[in-house]
């Protein structure tokens, strides 16, 4: 193995890695020894010195050593093993809920034990629940760790101890095999070498300040952060360069349809809408595919911008596809576009996963023949059996639900006769600038930063759940006395449609009993699209006073007469999602209110979140705060897609580096194409597939 590059050494060559463990490691994208070395600790534990048991404070993680006094199993309520140890300064109780007979036998009275865990205050003094422990041999001095102990991101069935043992082997291989230095010499001068940085981060010496590691300021981290941010930026440059190699249909100015639609509208587009449409039209006139992200706050009128872009393509005899994240939103878009486009003689088709049999087949034929010029749907519109007829523009609504990989797969899908469609991506989740510069560096960005006239800011109040009866009275007053409509939103912490639906049904029953004079509707994610649509339609037509809903109404629902929203358990949602929900009211000229009905006690973070919503109606301010509170991955909705999942970099903490990283990435992209490719392969193997497309 001597002299081999570690990206070519499979993990199966390490001792103890068989087929079963290989499969588990593959789930966290660990295939080679290089992958393992770049799988960095989440945090560290200091197990290098002993704490006297008598000095343990609650909440402190510590290593203690003591002699076993007794070890007992109790069966009251829950089966449990307790073991007491003493070091002369005090007694510690170790509690285990999962244990075996072998564990009980190893902890015999008189044995010496080294244990590590979080100290808690128990009934009989200090205790630790499920500490890691080791029975000591006959040594008079305990065997303490010589380095800080790493804690790695892991997956089911892979223990920390396994990852530590494998990493030990991988670090040993650094002596005989190479991990390639990919930074050009002018960049890496004065920096730690890559092997040095990896050794330091996997096995930090006890002299190293934990605070340096926790804040990401250690030179070993800075070395890897720079490399990872460069790889990310280089992948975006490669995607952009790739896009420039493709051909799109140039769609020159043809404003006949656009002017007809504008003349029929009861309002004039805002200056911001007009500016963004001009930016889009400029892109669509070119023979390379447009890749543009349009950000607009809730209610800023993105749908009209999308419609005007669509008309440019349709005027040239081409097709347009609009993809939305949910069937409810897709159907609402289809209805909006039909209202605008039918008078212009344009046929709008709708395609969703739930459509079956003849109806689906008929819709597919209408798309393939070109009879339908505008196709609206969920991701179902990009399934194999859907054939387009001159698709020239793809519009993706709520980009934030689709990661970089979906964005690219969709693009490959749309190409026909050597042409790639133009792409327009719309999000109502404003993205802070530093994040947009990094996560969407392959896209040009437009911002609709002006609300249409006649919108009123929503007044937001936070009220404890103990005053629920007062809030129900407030709903009665708004609906009966003021003639308004209201939403009551149920949220659940579990990502479970079933539990969420059950919670909404229970609330619906409660409110029907409490408000017998009101017509109360219910909509949740487990209802059939037709049922949801019927409820939404009767709410929109004013037949229902109150709509009980889950977060399915988060995006796109437009009922101007609704001026009151109650959000239950708002502490369970992020700021961006709460702001989206709140955007369902305040769509008419009447003063609107949003009540955040929270459960006490509130955590510090939840208090900050609710305060931000009370203070601001500006989506961009809220997004920046959300980034500060939650971190970039959650904000981009990419915990699943891996788009913002960095191994060592942190977009919030490292944002000051981003402008310099972008400059360096351009330098490497132009001067060192081989290194650029290798950096992307090392840090972002998924993206590499696409930049070669």
Swiss-Prot record:
One of its GO terms (cellular component) is Holliday junction helicase complex. SUPFAM superfamilies: Nucleic acid-binding proteins, P-loop containing nucleoside triphosphate hydrolases. A motif (DEAH box) lies at residues 397-400. Requires Mg(2+) for branch migration of all tested DNA. Induction: The last gene in the rpoZ-spoT-trmH-recG operon. Its cofactor is Mg(2+). Residues 48-146 are annotated as: Wedge domain. GO terms for molecular function: ATP binding; ATP hydrolysis activity; DNA binding; DNA helicase activity. Its EC number is 5.6.2.4. The wedge domain within the N-terminus inserts into the replication fork junction, where the lagging and leading strand split. Belongs to the helicase family. RecG subfamily. Monomer in solution. Probably a monomer on HJ DNA. Binding to fork DNA is facilitated by SSB; the proteins do not seem to stably associate. Plays a critical role in recombination and DNA repair. Helps process Holliday junction (HJ) intermediates to mature products by catalyzing branch migration. Has replication fork regression activity, unwinds stalled or blocked replication forks to make a HJ that can be resolved by RuvC or RusA. Also rewinds unwound dsDNA in an ATP-dependent manner. Has double-stranded (ds)DNA unwinding activity characteristic of a DNA helicase with 3'-5' polarity in vitro on linear dsDNA; branched duplex DNA (Y-DNA) substrates adopt different conformations that influence which of the two arms are unwound. This is ATP-dependent DNA helicase RecG. It comes from Escherichia coli (strain K12).
């Amino acid at each position: 193995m001597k002299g081999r590059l570690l990206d070519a050494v499979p993990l199966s060559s390490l001792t103890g890695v068989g087929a079963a463990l290989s499969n588990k490691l593959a789930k966290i994208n660990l295939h080679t020894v290089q992958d393992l070395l770049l799988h960095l600790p989440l945090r560290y534990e200091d197990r290098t010195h002993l704490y006297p048991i008598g000095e343990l404070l609650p909440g402190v993680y510590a290593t203690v050593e003591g002699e076993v006094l007794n070890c007992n199993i109790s069966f009251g309520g829950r089966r449990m093993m307790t073991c007491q140890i003493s070091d002369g300064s005090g007694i510690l109780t170790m509690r285990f809920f999962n244990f075996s007979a072998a564990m009980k036998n190893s902890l015999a009275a008189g044995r010496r034990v080294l244990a590590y865990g979080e100290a808690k205050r128990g009934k009989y003094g200090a205790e630790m629940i499920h500490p890691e422990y080791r029975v000591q041999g006959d040594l008079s001095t305990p065997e303490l760790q010589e380095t800080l102990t790493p804690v790695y991101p892991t997956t089911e069935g892979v223990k920390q101890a396994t990852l530590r043992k494998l990493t030990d082997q991988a670090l040993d291989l650094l002596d005989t095999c190479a991990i390639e230095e990919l930074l050009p010499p002018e960049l890496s001068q004065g920096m730690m070498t890559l092997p040095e940085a990896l050794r330091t981060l996997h096995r930090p010496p006890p002299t190293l300040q934990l605070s340096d590691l926790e804040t990401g300021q250690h030179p070993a981290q800075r070395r890897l952060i720079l490399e990872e941010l460069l790889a990310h930026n280089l992948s975006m440059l490669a995607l952009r360069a790739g896009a420039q190699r493709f051909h799109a249909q140039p769609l020159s100015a043809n404003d006949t349809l656009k002017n007809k639609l504008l003349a029929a509208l009861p309002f004039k587009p805002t200056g911001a809408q007009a500016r963004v449409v001009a930016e889009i039209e400029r892109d669509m006139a070119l023979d390379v595919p447009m890749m543009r992200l349009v950000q607009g706050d809730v209610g800023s009128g993105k749908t009209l911008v999308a419609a005007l872009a669509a008309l440019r393509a349709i005027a040239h005899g081409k097709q347009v596809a609009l993809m939305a994240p949910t069937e409810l939103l897709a159907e609402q878009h289809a209805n909006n576009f039909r209202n605008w486009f039918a008078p212009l003689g344009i046929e709008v088709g709708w395609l969703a996963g739930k459509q079956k049999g003849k109806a689906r087949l008929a819709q597919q034929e209408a798309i393939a023949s070109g009879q339908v010029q505008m196709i609206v749907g969920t991701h179902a519109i990009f399934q194999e059996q859907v054939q387009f007829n001159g698709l020239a523009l793809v519009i993706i609504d709520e980009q934030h639900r689709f990661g970089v990989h979906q964005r690219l797969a969709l693009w490959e899908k749309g190409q026909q006769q050597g042409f790639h469609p133009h792409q327009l991506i719309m999000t109502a989740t404003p993205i802070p600038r530093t994040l947009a510069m990094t996560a969407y560096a392959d896209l040009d960005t437009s911002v609709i930063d002006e609300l249409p006239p006649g919108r009123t800011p929503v007044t937001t109040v936070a009220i404890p759940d103990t005053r629920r009866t007062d809030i129900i009275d407030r709903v009665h007053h708004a609906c009966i006395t003021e003639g308004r409509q209201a939403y009551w939103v149920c949220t659940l912490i579990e990502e479970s449609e079933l539990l969420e639906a059950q919670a909404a049904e229970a609330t619906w029953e409660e409110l029907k009993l409490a408000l017998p004079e009101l017509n109360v509707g219910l909509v949740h994610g487990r209802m059939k699209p037709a049922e949801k649509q019927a409820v939404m339609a009767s709410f929109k037509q004013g037949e229902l006073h109150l709509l009980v809903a889950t977060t399915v109404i988060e995006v796109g629902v437009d009922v101007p007469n609704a001026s009151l929203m109650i959000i239950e358990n708002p502490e369970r949602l992020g700021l961006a999602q709460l702001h989206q929900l709140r955007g369902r009211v305040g769509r008419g000229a009447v003063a609107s209110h949003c009540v955040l009905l929270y459960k006490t006690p509130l955590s510090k973070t939840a208090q900050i979140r609710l305060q931000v919503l009370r203070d601001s109606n500006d989506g961009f301010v809220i997004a920046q705060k959300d980034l500060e509170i939650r971190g970039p991955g959650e904000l981009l909705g990419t915990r699943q897609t891996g788009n913002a999942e960095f191994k060592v970099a942190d977009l919030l903490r490292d944002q000051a580096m981003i402008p310099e990283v972008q400059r360096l990435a351009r330098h490497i992209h132009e001067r060192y194409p081989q290194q650029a490719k290798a950096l992307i392969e090392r840090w972002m193997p998924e993206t590499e597939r696409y930049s070669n497309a």
